[in-house]
A protein has these predicted regions:
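Core segments of cupin and vicinal oxygen chelate
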Residues: 7-56, 94, 98-111, 141-143, ...
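Conserved short beta-strand elements that form part of the metal-binding/catalytic scaffold
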Residues: 26-72, 112-136
Length: 161
């Protein structure tokens, strides 16, 4: 179980507030890294997303723990995550539109997601309840391995640059 993860954003407070709204939770400052915020889902699992200033790197620090180092912002990258929410699809799209973020309802074959492009650079796959049910049915241990093994490279979403 993943309890929390971190992403970078150009406006961490705004991003954390929007993510918290999508989750039905709350955004709070994240003191270990000044300028960062924590979008809390406020569920029994401690689920949340730490949002750091763009360019932040987490580097090893031995037994005292990792340290935060500020570098240059990067833009697009491969990191993304799927986030189940209790918010319905229409409200997800409205929240993304109000934030000025691109948002697309996508069919992944066995399940659907709403791609919300945080600051129009980083993707979060939002799973409203009906999409979460599809996703969980697909990712059951008895199904997901066989499905991934049988998948054809022809179904890849790779785009030449």
């Amino acid at each position: 179980m993943i309890h929390h993860l971190s992403i970078a954003a150009r406006d961490p407070q705004h991003v954390a507030c929007v993510l918290a709204e999508l989750m039905g939770g709350k955004a709070v400052p994240f003191p270990p890294n000044p300028g960062s915020f924590f979008a809390l889902q406020l569920d029994e699992y401690g689920s949340g997303v730490e949002v750091y200033p763009a360019g932040t790197e987490l580097q090893p620090g031995g037994t005292t723990g990792g340290s935060f180092v500020k570098k240059e912002a990067r833009g697009y990258g491969p990191t993304h995550f799927a986030l189940s929410v209790t918010t319905d699809a229409d409200k997800v799209e409205a929240i993304a539109a109000r934030a000025g973020w691109q948002c697309f309802c996508c069919n992944r074959g066995p399940f659907h997601v709403i791609e919300v492009w945080v600051e129009n650079e980083s993707m979060v796959e939002i799973l409203p309840p009906e999409f979460a049910r599809e996703y969980l049915a697909f990712t059951r241990p008895d199904k997901v391995t066989a499905a991934m093994t049988a998948a054809s490279p022809a179904t890849a979403r790779h785009r030449a640059t």
